Amino acid sequence: MMRVKKTSRKRAASHPSRIPKVELHQHVDGSIPVALAWKLMKRHRLNPVETVIQMEKLLVLQDQERGSLLRYLDKFHYPLWITQFYENIARVVEAIVEEAYQNQVRLLELRYSPVIHTYAGLTLRQTISAALSGINRAKKRFPVQAGLIVIAMRQHGPHIAKILARSAVAEGQQFHERTGVIGFDVAGLERGNSPKLFKEAYSIARIGGLGLTIHAGEDEGPHAIWQAIDDLGVTRIGHGCSSVGDKVLLRRLARDKILVECCITSNYQTGAVKPDRPHPIFTFLEYGIPVAICTDNTTVSGTNQTLENRRLVHKLTVPQLTMIHQNARNYSFIRTD
């Protein structure tokens, strides 16, 4: 259990940038650097506006758009125009890894939904291969551990999720000398798409040796997290904000050492956490629940790992932040053997 206490903002604020960081929850499509997105838009003559400044407003959540997960997810619309081509996918992934490394990220798990990158003719396996290629290019340039988590979108249904799970297993890290797929996730709007619907897909992923995580408790109640734990057997929860309303669930997360991937900036932007409420990460720490400090989408949220850590220094010391990152490394799906 980590005791949360106040510390001097002035003393701590200059140091989080130096912490070696672990990023366990970052989406490819929501993290493409604006300058690169604009360059690729122009190259393919797809730019919907005339200037990069106008483009930035379409890619980055604006103040008046805060408070809605739907408005937040709408920011993924334009990046999909350029990530339908193999080389573009590899290029944006390489750039994302580079940007993370510049923010002292030394272990990075990117996540990505292959289905929504097949509209121009790429197969599922080709879209996965393109993302892995981008990671491998970056790893040649920077000393960083990195891997790919495959996402199934809830709105595509359980059958597509099973197909994706099989494709992810086929590209698993155990079959690659370099980078492979390390995990499986389900994301998208939760309501009407309960975790138990995807039980077969998670069974395929588990048998195939993939790590298991899921987006749960972001726009749905604690029952979604209970299902994810009991029916799917996940070892990590993405967001998990609604669990603070269920003390029994909090104790279960602590007992089973299930890590919560906390995305502070994103959770306030989507309305998962109300503006006047403290972020659940502090409750998780008080209960002894493992956590990871995550960006979710660096471009959409206008954030990075350094900024996320700086948001926490009013209650956590730099040694505590360092310990969180060190412990998060133990929950990574990347194999080191």
PLM region spans:
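Metal-cofactor-binding active-site regions of metalloenzymes
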Residues: 3-210, 219-227, 231-236, 242-259, ...
